[in-house]
Regions:
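Helix-loop-helix hairpin linking two adjacent transmembrane segments in secondary transporters
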Residues: 151-195
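C-terminal transmembrane helical hairpin of 12-TM major facilitator-type secondary transporters
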Residues: 265-269, 282-334
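Extracytoplasmic
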Residues: 19-53, 73, 159-160, 240-245
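Conserved MFS/SLC helix-loop-helix module at the cytosolic interface between two early adjacent transmembrane helices
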Residues: 69-106, 280
Length: 412
């Protein structure tokens, strides 16, 4: 990047500092925050109600509702703007936190709230707010998307220990009530400072009929490549989620070292998010995407063949983390780059649904392999192959559009 372009890059970020800060605050307290804090409440509720881990795990199946709600939320954001749609989530998420605090121990109450969460919390998500960075930034689009997607992890790192202390001293019900109050306040502040559609550099709304917009997306060669690649690259979501620690133990890792590996993974996620975001702004989209999403293939292979507590194991975990951080940047950037910022949220919602479907398929596949007694080794080898194949698909993307600010689809 030339000196002149580099200067314009940072000037653009400075110009959009208030909208980006508001969007980052909003994304930080959005639905994504829950993945970093939800488990803090579980032990206390189990102790009071006698719920088993299996009973709580069933609630995770409600996440499949997101296959339908994320694309819908994205389409609403593209039609009516991020702020209007987000306000629905600002009511829903604190409301669900408050409802959790009034549970009496009946599982149907817990499941009902989880269902409400899956239906309405998506209105306050990166799918809705990401279009602010995608549309208001042209030179620094990758960095802006990375900034928004990193906010939940940063806030979660602060909130989780504070909530844990509050639960220990005041009980889990007051923990949920405090969380409801803080998230409501953050949501209102973020919404107040989000730019209006009449402001300068506003992301254009997509006013065409929904059927026409969907037809444009699915006819796009870039979208078909992106969706196929993300599907293949995300079968391993279960490994970097619920099965991460069990997988490390299965590969012979000392239990005392598991925490260290998880910390290394978390650091790698943040590094990957900003590294890939900056790279997307400077280098060819297809090559950056192929490299960023291809790293886990090597990571899975290293872990599958590594012995316990080796540098190969640590390197494999780090590669998984870097790619996990890169995933959202790549999905958002490719969608905005080839379909235009006006369709960012619809496209991002569809890709989020695709990755959720991939995670579900991967969970079923891993269960079959583990039930056969093969351990994680064969499944890791399978993931290495599918991930490498998915990453290679990014090389088929059309050449990057000459104009980074175009709002019209760049390919057919």
């Amino acid at each position: 990047m030339s000196t002149l372009r580099e200067s314009a890059y940072w000037q653009e970020l400075w110009r959009e500092r208030l909208p980006l800060s508001a969007a980052a605050l909003g994304t930080g307290f959005s639905i994504s925050l829950n993945m970093f804090i939800a488990s803090v409440f579980v032990p206390a509720m189990q102790a009071e109600f006698g719920w088993t881990g299996a009973q709580i795990s069933i609630a995770g199946s409600f996440g499949l509702i997101g296959l339908f709600t994320f694309p819908l939320a994205g389409r609403l954001a593209d039609r009516f703007g991020s702020r209007r749609v987000m306000l629905g989530g600002v009511a829903a998420i604190p409301g669900c936190y408050l409802l959790y605090s009034f549970q009496s121990g009946a599982l149907w109450q817990y499941y009902s709230i989880q269902a409400l969460w899956s239906l309405f919390a998506v209105l306050w998500s990166a799918t809705v707010l990401g279009r602010i960075a995608a549309g208001r930034l042209t030179l620094a689009r990758g960095f802006g998307i990375a900034l928004l997607l990193s906010a939940p992890a940063a806030i979660g790192a602060i909130a989780a220990p504070l909530l844990s202390e509050l639960i220990d001293s005041e009980g889990w019900r007051n923990g949920y009530r405090a969380l409801a109050a803080v998230s409501l306040g953050a949501g209102v502040i973020a919404a107040a400072f989000l730019p209006s559609q009449e402001s300068a550099h506003a992301t254009p709304l997509d006013q065409r009929p929904d059927r026409e917009a969907m037809r444009a997306i699915f006819r796009s060669r870039a979208f078909r490549i992106l969706a196929s690649a993300m599907l293949l690259c995300n079968f391993g979501t279960i490994i970097t989620g619920l099965q991460f620690a069990p997988m490390l133990l299965n590969r012979g890792t000392d239990p005392a070292r598991v925490g260290g590996y998880l910390s290394a993974y978390a650091i790698a996620v943040i590094v990957g998010r900003f590294t890939i975001g900056l790279s997307l702004d400077r280098f060819s989209t297809r090559y950056v995407a192929a490299l960023g999403m291809g790293l886990p293939a090597l990571g899975f292979a290293l872990i599958a063949g590594a012995e316990a507590a080796t540098w190969a194991m640590l390197a494999g975990v780090a590669l998984l983390g870097i790619s996990q951080g890169a995933e959202g940047d790549i999905a958002g950037y490719v969608g905005a780059q080839f379909l235009g910022p006006g369709l960012f949220s619809t496209t991002f919602g569809l890709i989020t649904a695709t990755t959720s479907l991939a995670g579900f398929i991967g969970s079923v596949a891993s269960g079959i392999v583990l039930n056969e007694g093969g351990g994680f080794g064969p499944f890791l080898a399978f993931l290495a192959v599918t991930t490498a194949t998915g990453a290679a698909l990014f090389l088929l993307l059309p050449r990057t559009p000459h104009s980074r600010s175009t709002n019209a689809p760049a390919d057919t």
